[in-house]
Amino acid sequence: MKITIHRGLNQIGGCITEIQSLSGTKILIDLGHNLPDGGGVSEDMYESPENLDYILDGCSAVFYTHYHGDHLGFAAEIHERGVAQYMGPLAIKIMIHLNDHMTYAEKLKDRAKANLKALNEFKTFAIGRKTIIGDIAITPYGVSHSAPDSYMFLIECDGKKVLHTGDFRDHGYLGKGLYTMLEKHIIPQGIDVLITEGTNVGQKSKSVLSEQEISSQFRQIMRKYKNIFILSSSADADRLWSIYRAHN
C-alpha cells in the first residue's frame, strides 16, 4: 500500500490523503479548499483544472470525513470527471439543502446548481459496515464535530490497517462516545498507520470549552440582557442545541 499526503503536513485544514493499493486501486480521503488566511483570502492549487486532473488520475472514489469546505470543495468538478463520491447520509442532505438555498442568490446560483447535480449522485455508507472499492475496504465510524454526521475511516489494504481520523473532538454532546468507540471497535483490530488532524496540536494554553459550558455561558448572558442577537452557523447542530438549551 502507498500512502500520499498531498496536502496538510504543513498547514491546518485542507488535508488530502491518497491511498493506493499494490494492484493500483486508488482512493482519496477529503478533497477541499485551503482555509482562508487572516485576510479572508484562500489560494488553492486545485482550482487549476490541470492540477485537479492530476490528483484525480486513476482515482476510483473520494471519501469525505465531513462537509466543511476544507474537506469538501470540488464536488461538481469531481462529478464531471466521473469519480464516485461518498459521504454520510445526513451530511449529503444538509449540503443539498444548503446549495438549494444558495440557488436564490444570483452570484451563487450557477455554482450551487452544479453542486446539486453532483450531490444528488453522491453515494453513502453505514457506520461499522465496509465499503469495498477494488481491493481497498473502508469502514466509517461516527465522531463528534461541529459538522453533524462526521466520520473517521478505518482503511484496510494489502494486509495493513490505516485509521484516518478526520476532524474530531471530545467536547461536543456526542464526544463522550469517542473513547468507547475507539476501545471497542478500533484498538482491538490493531492499527498500522494513524493519520490524524492537528487543528489544536501545540496549543496547550488554548482553553477549549465544552458545549455544555458554552450553553451555560449563553444562559447567563440571556438572563443579564433583554435583547440578544446570536450569529451562528445554521449547520452546527451542537451549537444550535446549546443556544436552545440556554433559552429554555
Positions of PLM-derived features:
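Terminal amphipathic helices with adjacent charged low-complexity linkers/tails
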Residues: 246-248
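Conserved G/P- and acidic residue-centered "switch" motifs that form tight phosphate/ATP-binding loops
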Residues: 66
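His/Asp/Glu-rich metal-coordinating catalytic cores
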Residues: 2-61, 70-238, 242
